[in-house]
Amino acid sequence: MTDVASSIAAGMQAQTPGVVLASASPARVAVLRSAGVAFTQKPASVDERSVHAALQKEGELTLPGDIAELLAITKATEVSTGDPDALVIGADQMLAFEDRTLEKPVDFDAARNQLLELRGNTHVLHSAVCLCRGGQHVWTHVDTATMMMRDFSPEFVGRYLSVAGASVLTSVGAY
């Protein structure tokens, strides 16, 4: 490549905003990589449990999809204010089961209990994604998936947890 062509290519790359994933989620990283998206990862420092608890206490945004959307916006906005030229992706999920919202399990006992509670039952996963640039959200989307978890034994859960390992603690469904 000639010096002129190299300069033009470098200039074009410098003008193209980068894509930043505001998440530590291995699953989200895998999705972007498998789609061939070039990105950097800068996890947001949002305390999801505190935000969720505050919303419930105030009696606002108690619908799981709304909470997931607010968390996705909060994460993307936080990271995009520090990298204003980047297109920042924030995402979150909330799981609705019966009349309550479940969060990521805090340990393996909580994961075991959650899986045993979900087995043989239907639950709804609310997924939200937000794109931000310069601290402003430019696009959001929320979708839901209604899922039926098959019935299984407590022994199966034990084997599953030993094989899946700590990854179950990064998912609201422990799966």
Regions found by a protein language model. Name each.
Residues 37-40, 106-108:
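Glycine-rich, phosphate-binding/catalytic loops in enzymes
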Residues 24, 44, 134:
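Cofactor-binding loop segments of dinucleotide-utilizing enzymes, especially the Rossmann-like FAD-
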Residues 38-50:
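A short beta-strand-loop structural module common to alpha/beta enzyme folds
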Residues 49-56, 116:
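Short, charged, surface-exposed secondary-structure boundary motifs
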Residues 6-38:
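N-terminal beta1-alpha1 ligand-phosphate binding loop
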Residues 27, 47-49, 137:
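Surface-exposed, flexible loop/turn segments at secondary-structure boundaries
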Residues 2-19, 58-175:
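Anionic-ligand binding patches
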